[in-house]
Amino acid sequence: RMGELVVKYAGGALALNDKPRAAAVIKFAAITEGITSLLAYAILVGLADLAARFIIKDPSVTVYILVYGLMIIGNMLAETGTAVLQITNHFRSQAILNLFQNVTTAVWIGIAFLTKSGLGSILAGYLMGKMIFGIGTVALMLAHAPAALGKGWWRTSLKGLSDWRSLAQFAFTTNLSGTINMVIRDSEVLWVGFFLTKADAGYYKFALAIMNIILMP
């Protein structure tokens, strides 16, 4: 959730035309997000086998967990990049990227379904979409940021962030809150898989998807 930090601190700095501070905040956010993403994937690697055995109850899917988990690496700067596009008013670029991601995923999965390619191809389609979004977001950030922050903005020293403790505290609290919400709200399918079967988890996931469509305003 580093996007909130970028919007609050870098966006505020840009509003005051303090480009060096905005650049330093974005650099701080990108470094922090990159490090935590690498740590997250390392934790995933360590827990993948346990998840396959006790939640999915099929050790053979460990490789699928590891491969699909590469989306963490592909999106390691996505939060920061998305926030930079927002504070620099490049919403149209975001919309086009999202559309391209969704179309690519839908076409890939559609082909996999028609050719009966199996679970691996379907996961590859989802992974491709996530990679397009993550890498595309960073590419757009690097393309548009110089106009708002100046050329060579990434070389800005972090020493200018005298309130780095405040930034770190904000990042920690927002990410902790997001993690708690995710564990409570988004882990239902995992608990179903743990206590029941993977088929039950699949049915529950499908039911949630249908319910979300029905409840859409």
Predicted feature locations:
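Hydrophobic/aromatic end-of-helix segments at the C-terminal termini of transmembrane alpha-helices
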Residues: L47, A51, I184-L196
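Alpha-helical transmembrane segments of multi-pass membrane proteins
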Residues: A42, G46, K57-G81, A95-L99
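Small-residue-rich midsections of specific transmembrane alpha-helices
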Residues: R1-A15, A30-S37, I72-T80, N175-S187, ...
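Alpha-helical transmembrane segments of multi-pass membrane transport and lipid-handling proteins
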Residues: K27-I56, V67, I111
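Interfacial/gating helices of multi-pass transporter permease domains
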Residues: V25, S60-T62, L119-A124, S162-T174, ...
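Interhelical loop/hinge segments that connect adjacent transmembrane helices in multipass membrane
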Residues: L119, L123, T137-R185
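Helix-loop interface residues and adjacent transmembrane-helix termini in multi-pass membrane transporters
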Residues: D58, I87-T88, T115-K116, V183, ...
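Hydrophobic alpha-helical transmembrane segments
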Residues: T62, L66, I96-A148, G152, ...
